[in-house]
Amino acid sequence: FLYWMKKTANRYLPLSSDETIGVVIMPHGATKPYNDAVERTIEPLRSKYKIEMAYGMGDAVTIQNAISNLENQGIKKIVFVRMYPTSDQLKEKTDYILGLSDKIPEQWDGLIPPQIRNSAVINTFGGYEEDNLIAGIFLERIKELSKKPEEETIILLAHGGSNDKAENLRKKRM
């Protein structure tokens, strides 16, 4: 009940000029070189936002810890970033865990974890592949690596979707 009261109050409080927005970033997580690259990428954002990382594919304990760490710093408004290619990737799962939805996701595998307990107002987004800026980022990275463009071929690889429906949607978007 106390969490609900705080969350309701936070929803109506305007963001003051000295108040910081918290950000939880949920990348896939992998090997140390991958994780280090992610950390370097988001480092410039740390001067403007309080940031917590929640590596993994929607682990409720990791998400709870990240949200709690921000709340313990006085953060009342949080942006939850699903750092995945498409906007719908893990959205149902994380929305359920974050308490933004009561619908148990269709693609759920294993035991259903509890929804997190928090008083912050949370908004979510994801889907970097759907943003036109990604093409410019790819081009910039290719130019950094390229030595002899006239002799080189660029191949982009991805492991694909978790099911045929997701893969067909991905191909349609391309």
What spans do the regions from the language model cover?
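Active-site-proximal alpha-helix that buttresses catalytic centers in soluble enzyme cores
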Residues: 1-174
